[in-house]
């Protein structure tokens, strides 16, 4: 029985990529005896989704750069690269990770709104496909390092188009109050004055209006803005050769709503943009990897507490994973489906599913309908392949979890979990003056 994409229930046991999830934790415990939770990813699904994305936008010849911030696990980067995608990095660390996993200079896109000298130097010295510059002054920094390295760096100016995606405020990036990008008029002036930066190939525009977008309307509005800017810049004698439409493609975390209409959206863009002769770039992240991962966690405790009103008692299910592992519910109010690995017989009833962190925000779901659960049972938090492990922390003195991959029926530990006893390894007592 299929539960979600890549998720099935075989013989009563939940499986990811055909791998029974109870087997995953049992295998991990041979390496990490105390493990009670871990991340699990289906690499075949990652590659299949990357291939599907590339095929959908093939009519435009889109150069797709996978957004490392979604999940930068080396095993995942290798599969994305195998599918023919490039890498989009938002920091020096992500640039280095992309280089380490074999992404060539022309396959690395540098993003971010707080450009550092180290990032600019890397782009000039090591080479990138392009840099998305967030403001005009950044061009001076990029020019300095490109001139010193004796190279030319291609640059796209990020434009804030004033488009509201009507999603969570923390993932809306294209409205007027967002911190990203320059006004369209500023970009037009900079493109016309590109001779000021002779070591830069300043012929691109970058628009990224938000994340977790299920209605393609805002993305198509951004594409219209990009086309209008390219046409106006050409009229001013400064034609553009690169249009980067960013990412933002959402996934249906509820399992009840519509999926992002990827192929239909791609077809509409191809029809409306085909006449614009430029190089196209997109930066998918979440859409590629979120459905391919789960957070697997043991049930530590189940408790019932009597109510103080007519509402009666409340059932709390305490997991071995917490908000330090999967921050999205606490940070964004995000809701993930939570499914028992082995469903016990009995009526489904509401439960508040929480973690062990000493915070009232450490709640995965307040009204999850779940069958009876007991201590030691396993549950899977679905669609956890993006913005999960990459955002985890050691808050509350908790070690980060191991990351396990399923690859064609083979199970591997791709990243070791942290032992709480070794979390002080970075602590020092070193005088910095005197």
What positions do the PLM features span?
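Active-site loop/helix belt of alpha/beta enzymes
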Residues: 2, 145, 161-305, 370-373, ...
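Short, glycine- and charge-enriched coil/turn segments that flank and shape catalytic ligand pockets
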Residues: 59-60, 147-151, 236-237, 256-259, ...
């Amino acid at each position: 029985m299929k539960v979600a994409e890549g998720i099935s229930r075989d013989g009563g046991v939940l499986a990811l990529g055909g791998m029974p999830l109870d087997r995953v934790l049992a295998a991990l415990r041979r390496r990490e005896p105390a493990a009670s939770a871990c991340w699990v990813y289906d690499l075949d699904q990652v590659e299949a989704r990357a291939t599907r994305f590339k095929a959908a936008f093939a009519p435009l010849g889109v150069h797709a750069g996978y957004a490392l911030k979604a999940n930068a696990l080396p095993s995942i980067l290798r599969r994305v690269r195998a599918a023919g995608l490039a890498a989009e990095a938002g920091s020096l660390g992500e640039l280095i990770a992309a280089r380490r996993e074999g992404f060539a200079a022309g396959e690395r896109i540098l993003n971010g709104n707080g450009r550092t000298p180290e990032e600019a130097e890397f782009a000039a010295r090591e080479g990138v496909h392009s840099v998305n510059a967030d403001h005009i002054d950044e061009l001076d920094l990029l020019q300095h390092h490109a001139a010193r390295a004796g190279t030319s760096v291609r640059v796209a100016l990020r434009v804030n188009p004033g488009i509201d995606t009507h999603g969570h405020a923390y993932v809306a990036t294209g409205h007027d109050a967002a911190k990203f990008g320059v006004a369209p008029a500023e970009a037009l002036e900079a493109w016309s004055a590109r001779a000021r930066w002779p070591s830069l190939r300043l012929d691109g525009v970058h628009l990224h209006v938000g994340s977790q977008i299920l209605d393609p309307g805002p993305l198509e509005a951004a594409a219209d803005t990009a086309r209008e800017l390219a046409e106006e810049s050409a009229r001013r004698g400064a034609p553009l050769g690169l249009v980067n439409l960013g990412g933002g493609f959402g996934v249906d975390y509820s399992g009840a709503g519509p999926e992002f209409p990827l192929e239909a959206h791609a077809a509409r863009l191809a029809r409306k943009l085909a006449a614009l002769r430029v190089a196209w770039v997109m930066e998918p992240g979440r859409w590629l990897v979120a459905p391919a991962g789960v957070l697997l966690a043991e049930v530590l405790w189940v408790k019932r507490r009597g109510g103080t009103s007519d509402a009666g008692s409340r059932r709390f299910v305490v997991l071995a994973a917490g908000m330090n592992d999967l921050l999205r519910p606490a940070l964004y109010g995000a809701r993930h489906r939570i499914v028992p690995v082995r469903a016990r017989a009995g009526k489904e009833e509401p439960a508040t599913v929480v973690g062990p962190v000493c915070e009232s925000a450490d709640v995965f779901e307040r009204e999850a309908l779940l069958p009876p659960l007991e201590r030691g049972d396993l549950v899977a938090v679905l669609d956890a392949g993006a913005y999960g492990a990459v955002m985890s922390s050691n808050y509350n003195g908790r070690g980060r979890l191991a990351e396990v991959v399923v690859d064609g029926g083979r199970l591997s530990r791709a990243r070791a979990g942290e032992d709480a006893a070794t979390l002080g390894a970075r602590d020092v007592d070193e005088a910095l003056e005197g």
